[in-house]
Amino acid sequence: MDNLVFSLNATVAIFLMMVLGLFFNKIGWMDEEFANKINKFVFRIPLPVLLFGDLAVVDIKEAWDTKFVIFCFIITLISITIAIGISCLLKDRNIQGEFIQAAYRSSAALLGIAFIQNIYGNSGQAPLMIIGSVPLYNIMAVVVLSFFKPGQKGMNKALVKKTLIGITTNPIIIGIAAGLLWSALKLPMPVILHKAVSSIGGVATPMGLMAMGATFDIKKAFGKIKPTVIAAFIKLVGFVAVFMPLAVVIGFRREKLIAILVMLGSATTVSSYVMAKNMGHEGVVSSSVVMLTTMCSAFTLTGWLFIMKCFGLV
């Protein structure tokens, strides 16, 4: 029950922020043009700063576990490959990129540490899970959203070059790289800088969620209900059911299993919507999957946690 309450506290708050954005739009306080400007701002400043702050304070050398990081990386890569394969069955090719990203991209950085701290009292292996998965999440998001952009026809040198430039100049990837470099060099984080990073990064989620809610089109969302439900099922149930037994067989337990659970089965992150909108996609599937997985993840995560506890794994 405690885990259900914790999950509900985390997910309901996120959902209410989206509803608040929708409400602001309906009463004329946050029109679509304003919401789109907020999206661009969140994408360029607060979100990269948030990820930088999460990774910069991690002691990589002390917490390092090569097997665990490699496992997280490989499973993330396989998950993305599966999502790409399933997306080929979609009739509407214009939503393929959004579907792929929404199906694999978790709220790992935002939810991972908090979820494990609630259970064990410390962040455990969450930082290593973030290192193994989040950089790949974002690099592949740029690749997927570039190659499967609406109206895009085939691959060519210009597209490959544009994608590579997109990866190296993507604000989120720059934030992750800066955070990892800061941590690897063991640079001190002055109190003033830490407070500034926390303050700027702290607005990423609420602003991004409200902007997403403000641009959410209910009619269009219902028109994309089938791919939305499929992507949400893959995100919350499919990948966990496939890969969690493998993690158990390999020997991962307790904090590591919880970190893997969050990586595989947490709600789709709001940054997937922010990035999709900023890379020329409609954003309807992204926002719909974020909303649906956010509503359902409190119950699915708690269900998976209950199953693992019954088997004495956590």
Language-model-detected regions and their locations in the chain:
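Alpha-helical transmembrane segments of multi-pass small-molecule/ion transporters
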Residues: M1-V314
